[in-house]
Amino acid sequence: MATGGSGGGGGGGGGGDDVHGLKFGKKIYFEQDAAASASAAAVESSSTSSGGGGKKGKGVAAAAAPPPPLPPRCQVEGCGVDLSGVKPYYCRHKVCYMHAKEPIVVVAGLEQRFCQQCSRFHQLPEFDQEKKSCRRRLAGHNERRRKPTPGPLSSRYGRLAASFHEEPGRSRSFVVDFSYPRVPSSVRDAWPAIQPSDRMSGSIQWQGGHELHPHRSAVAGYSDHHAFSSHGGSAAGAPMLHHPAFELTSGGCLAGVATDSSCALSLLSTQPWDTTQSTSSHNRSPPMSSTASAFGGGNNPVSPSVMASNYMAASPGWNSSSRGHDGARNVHLPPPHGVVLNEVPPGSVHHGHFSGELELALQGGAPSNRPEAEHGSGSGAFSHSTNAMNWSL
């Protein structure tokens, strides 16, 4: 029993202790719970207070909305006109209609002018008062509106000039057409159809004249330039030899060609030139008939082989006082006595020297038959480039 009592006591004590402990623990528990509950309540109260504050902040933010924007006004000093009821252009650039066209306005303390091309205020040196636009914008505007000048090359090379005005850093490229130009049909029909194989016929007759002689340098002495006075002019009454059968060959033209381009036609042609009409009116003067009668008679025509030119005599007494085309002195030689003109051999026409018989005849008849200049002229009768005179005894 004691044990039990003791055990009971012990148990009671233990129970008291337990109760006391339980009480203490409970107390402790309740204290911890109270502290936890107090902390939880504090946290809850803080959360609720924060939540309430957030709701209140949203309301404050909603209540404190920004005021409506101010109406646009003109930025020119001293104006400040409300632009709410005007066009959007003036509202966007903040300038009234009146100051947009004023020549001088004050903006930000500077005298400026509104440019209606770029919609900005520019200072007066940058502005063109006549065009009412800034110079930079105006230059670009004119380049864009300028049209190329009309012409045959405007369609092909219209963009060539514009490419040189671009910025230096940009690459430039253009296309040039090197194709053969097309000849209009009107011009093409007006040109004569000339073939390379065409040649000038030998029957072409050149009408003689002072200005339109075909071969001035080749047939010197045959047309207007047949005789020269001591002053360089043509002799008015110098006797001349002329016959319609005379023909100037291409070889004769070659001997006297200097720079005359018309002689080139005779070089291309295989037929001889016919210069029967190349003498002027003064070649048919009365001294011609007298000279023709002296050489071959008035009725007998003089053959082409008899016509001579530029004979250089051995003695200085045979030279006249004036020079011809090629620098040699031209003389008028009457035929020596006993010379028959009709018996000249045809093969001796193109030789530049006399036969032995002719030289003897000329030396024998030279002192008595010296020619005298007619009509007071110092010129000879005729001049030719072959330098040949053929007479036979």
Swiss-Prot record:
Its main location: nucleus. It comes from the Eukaryota. GO terms for molecular function: DNA binding; zinc ion binding. A motif (Bipartite nuclear localization signal) lies at residues 131-147. It is found in: Nucleus. GO terms for cellular component: nucleus. PROSITE patterns: ZF_SBP. Zn(2+) 2 binds at residues 115, 118, 122, 134. Gene3D superfamilies: Transcription factor, SBP-box domain. Trans-acting factor that binds specifically to the consensus nucleotide sequence 5'-TNCGTACAA-3'. May be involved in panicle development. This is Squamosa promoter-binding-like protein 17. It comes from Oryza sativa subsp. japonica. The gene is SPL17.
